[in-house]
């Protein structure tokens, strides 16, 4: 039984509430959004918190919700209760996810990282082409995918997270800080999670590299089939097979090898920046911060990963 908002209805909620205490579910969810250093943060937190077993992102609350809460809890079966349980997964923009998390983990705390809307839009474009969700030029994809117009509405989405979890339980960080001062950024996150600070100088293997996509796939047909296989394996929690294919370079071969992505033009950047200006100003008011840097032309479009 479903509520009007897509979350579990009262009867369904009561049915699993009696066993929820026997499950181990995340206390903290890093909700992204995507393309904001989530992979980097997951790597840094490994060994300091209990993360999902075998996979970085379960995508339970947006993609695999119909599999049920026990499917999700199975990812944390290794947790003993001695460490914080955390998932890093880009749920931020999904309209159904906040209420679903609230229904199952009412005391969950949320970490978000916000990025210049122009950079984020360009990075998202490269991602959807890389995984063959779309093909074409930046302008063609922007016109064909409705979610591009609604994504980056940070203030609108943040209000929902604040309303459901309480403003004090939602940490809002900035991607610019991660890139410029990764230690300072990480300190804020670990303090919020409630674990000892992690010194990046002691983890040279981590570095400050954030995963980016430089090229389109050599074959959209091949990339689509690789993506379907990846999701098929994930739905069955066959992460060992998926990870083996990754280590063997299969995913990189399927998703890469095509033409490099051209940088945004000045006209494209200006158009996107003007489109999101009201939302940026709303975010400034909501958070009480100055985001004037997001209102100016930037010289980093070609490297936006």
State each model region's role.
Residues 2-305:
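Anion-recognition interface
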């Amino acid at each position: 039984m479903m509520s009007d908002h897509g979350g579990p209805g009262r009867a369904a909620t009561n049915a699993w509430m009696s066993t929820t205490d026997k499950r181990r579910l995340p206390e903290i969810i890093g909700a992204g959004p995507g393309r904001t250093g989530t992979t980097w943060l997951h790597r840094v937190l490994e060994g300091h918190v209990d993360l999902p077993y075998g996979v970085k992102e379960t995508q339970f609350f947006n993609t695999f919700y119909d599999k049920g809460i026990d499917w999700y809890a199975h990812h944390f079966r290794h947790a003993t209760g001695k460490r914080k349980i955390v998932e890093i997964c880009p749920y931020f923009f999904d309209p159904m996810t906040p209420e679903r998390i609230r229904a199952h983990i009412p005391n969950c705390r949320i970490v978000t990282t916000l990025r210049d809307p122009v950079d984020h839009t360009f990075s998202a474009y490269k991602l959807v082409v890389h995984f063959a969700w779309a093909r074409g030029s930046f302008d063609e994809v922007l016109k064909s995918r409705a979610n591009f117009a609604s994504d980056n509405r940070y203030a609108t989405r943040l209000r929902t997270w604040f309303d459901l979890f309480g403003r004090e339980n939602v940490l809002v960080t900035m991607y610019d800080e991660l890139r410029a001062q990764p230690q300072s950024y990480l300190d804020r996150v670990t303090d919020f999670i409630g674990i000892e600070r992690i010194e990046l100088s002691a983890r040279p293997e981590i570095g400050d590299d954030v995963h980016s996509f430089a090229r389109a796939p050599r074959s959209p047909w091949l990339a689509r089939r690789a993506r379907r296989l990846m999701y098929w394996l994930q739905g069955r929690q066959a992460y060992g097979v998926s990870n083996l294919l990754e280590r063997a370079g299969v995913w990189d071969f399927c998703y890469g090898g095509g033409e490099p992505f051209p940088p945004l033009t000045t006209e494209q950047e200006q158009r996107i920046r003007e489109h999101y200006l009201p939302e940026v100003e709303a975010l400034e008011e909501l958070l009480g911060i100055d985001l004037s840097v997001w209102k100016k032309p930037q010289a980093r479009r070609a490297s936006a990963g």
